[in-house]
Amino acid sequence: MIRDLEYYDSPILRKVAAPIDEITDELRQLVLDMSETMTFYKGVGLAAPQVGHSVALFIMGVEKELDDGELIFCDFPKVFINPVITQKSEQLVYGNEGCLSIPGLRGEVARPDKITVTAKNLDGQPFSMTLEGFLARIVMHETDHLHGVLYIDRMSDKDKTKQFKNNLEKIRRKYSILRGL
């Protein structure tokens, strides 16, 4: 089932997500729904708070990035439960980011080029991955969602132009009206 997205200015996007203690049938269904939702909206990652669930879970739909920048998508997304970024490279790389919860806007964000993340999969088994480049960026972006942080919070002030701020305000107003606020 395709879930409704939470958009910029939704309070759930600013909450710290609760850890997941148990893998339940409801959690498995949430992951299936998130996968359908991410595919429908053409995302590369999706965090549970973006579909209204403040739990420490995200999915990533990209398996690898080729040398020419082409993305290879997974048949079924990688599931990260209670993810923790345990290592980050000191080298920062700027990259252009967008977010399904902030439609139509993109911004330059500096992030470590290489990370190691530990998490549990949908079977409750712990795993660790070292990622670099775009895949590392996806994991950091989605992990930020679980801490109530949006990519716009990581943009430098000089990149938040007046036009960018005006567009952000338009998004806030549009989706506040749709939520009935």
Swiss-Prot record:
Entry annotation: catalytic residues: E142
Pfam families, alphabetized: Pep_deformylase
CDD domains assigned: Pep_deformylase
Catalytic class of the enzyme: hydrolase
Catalytic activity from the UniProt record: N-terminal N-formyl-L-methionyl-[peptide] + H2O = N-terminal L-methionyl-[peptide] + formate
EC code(s) of this entry: 3.5.1.88
Domain of life (superkingdom): Bacteria
Cofactor descriptive note: Binds 1 Fe(2+) ion.
Keywords: Hydrolase, Iron, Metal-binding, Protein biosynthesis
Protein residues bound to Fe cation: C99, H141, H145
Family, per entry: Belongs to the polypeptide deformylase family.
Function: Removes the formyl group from the N-terminal Met of newly synthesized proteins. Requires at least a dipeptide for an efficient rate of reaction. N-terminal L-methionine is a prerequisite for activity but the enzyme has broad specificity at other positions.
Protein name as it appears in the record: Peptide deformylase
Lineage, highest ranks first: Bacteria, Pseudomonadati, Chlamydiota, Chlamydiia, Chlamydiales
GN (gene name): def
